[in-house]
């Protein structure tokens, strides 16, 4: 007959307990070495610590662009919409006097760190992560994750207008970053790197000549199309990124951010159109002739 005996409530040493690896745990959990392994090699960092480190790298990397963007946006997006004649060049000269000579290098370093940390962060977040359920593309907001990772800034036009928030497999901010990188490299190539290599500077007179060029390849593929893509993706990526950086979570506030982003984008397109319609026949030789000639030489294109 089994009898129960009262024992004093003393702590039990776990080392004195029997270890049965296969009784209640998956194979390998009984190993005293609890370090995680990748390809069989133990590593000391957890996924959360990697995320935290990469997120901090992204936060630090935006500082040069966050300081530069207001000046550049006022010069390139707003001023030409108000007065496309000489005002943009006047503001450009003033901005160049304010900024240090290493501005471009700081921006390139910050962008490189930002992109690298972002790609690695995506890899860490998606490591062994189950795929999202793709059913029920539009959901009622009360049942849905309304974070920017899930629905973007406002969940698309339907979310902005009607509260039917669209979920995205890849966040719109990430997509805009993927689009932004190649056009930004092209922008730096024709506006900074190649002009510096031939000892010239690009101003708004050059931009007007490019956008009103009789050469359709220069005008559209070399000028208007990449500038429009840069404008749309850049303003959205920076605006939604700042919204996330400042911890804006309320949907009403995010809709206000979205409205501001759309208005700034619209003003930017007005600036492009006004610059394109400017008379560039009295502006002298087109500097982009030498710039594109240099690019053709670099690409070995006749």
Swiss-Prot record:
Q: On the Cytoplasmic side, which residues?
A: 1-61, 122-173, 241-258
Segments of this protein annotated with the region Disordered: 1-35
Q: List the disulfide bonds.
A: none
**Domain of life according to the entry:** Eukaryota
Q: Plastid as a keyword?
A: no
Assigned keywords, A-Z: Membrane, Mitochondrion, Mitochondrion outer membrane, Transmembrane, Transmembrane helix
GO biological process entries: lipid homeostasis; mitochondrion organization; protein localization to mitochondrion
Give the bilayer topology: Multi-pass membrane protein
* Annotated SUPFAM superfamilies: Fumarate reductase respiratory complex transmembrane subunits
Q: Where is it mostly found?
A: mitochondrion
**Keyword Membrane in record:** yes
Known partners and oligomeric status: Interacts (via PxP motif) with VPS13 (via SHR-BD domain).
Name of this chain's protein? Mitochondrial adapter protein MCP1
Organism of derivation: Saccharomyces cerevisiae (strain ATCC 204508 / S288c)
């Amino acid at each position: 007959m089994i009898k129960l005996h009262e024992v004093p409530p003393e702590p039990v040493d776990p080392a004195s307990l029997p270890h049965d690896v296969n009784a209640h745990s998956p194979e390998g959990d009984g190993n005293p070495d609890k370090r995680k392994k990748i390809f069989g090699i133990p590593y000391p960092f957890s996924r959360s610590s990697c995320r935290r480190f990469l997120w901090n790298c992204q936060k630090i990397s935006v500082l040069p662009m966050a300081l530069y963007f207001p000046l550049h946006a006022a010069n390139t997006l707003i001023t030409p919409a108000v007065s496309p004649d000489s005002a943009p060049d006047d503001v450009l000269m003033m901005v160049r006097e304010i900024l240090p000579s290493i501005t471009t290098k700081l921006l390139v370093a910050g962008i490189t760190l930002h992109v690298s940390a972002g790609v690695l962060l995506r890899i860490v977040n998606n490591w062994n992560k189950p795929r999202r359920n793709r059913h029920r593309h539009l959901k009622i907001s009360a049942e849905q994750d309304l974070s920017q990772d899930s629905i973007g800034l406002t969940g698309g036009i339907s979310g902005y207008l009607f509260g039917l928030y669209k979920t995205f497999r890849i966040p719109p901010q990430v997509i805009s970053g993927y689009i932004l990188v190649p056009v930004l490299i092209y922008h730096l190539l024709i506006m900074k790197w190649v002009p510096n290599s031939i000892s010239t500077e690009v101003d708004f007179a050059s931009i007007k000549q490019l956008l009103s060029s009789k050469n359709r390849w220069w005008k559209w593929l070399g000028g208007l199309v990449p500038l429009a893509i840069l404008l749309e993706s850049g303003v959205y990526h920076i605006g939604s990124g700042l919204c996330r950086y400042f911890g804006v979570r309320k949907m009403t506030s995010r809709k206000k951010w979205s409205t501001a982003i759309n208005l700034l984008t619209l003003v930017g397109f007005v600036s492009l159109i006004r610059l394109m319609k400017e008379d560039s026949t009295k502006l002298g030789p087109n500097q982009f002739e030498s710039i594109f000639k240099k690019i053709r030489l670099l690409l070995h294109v006749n």
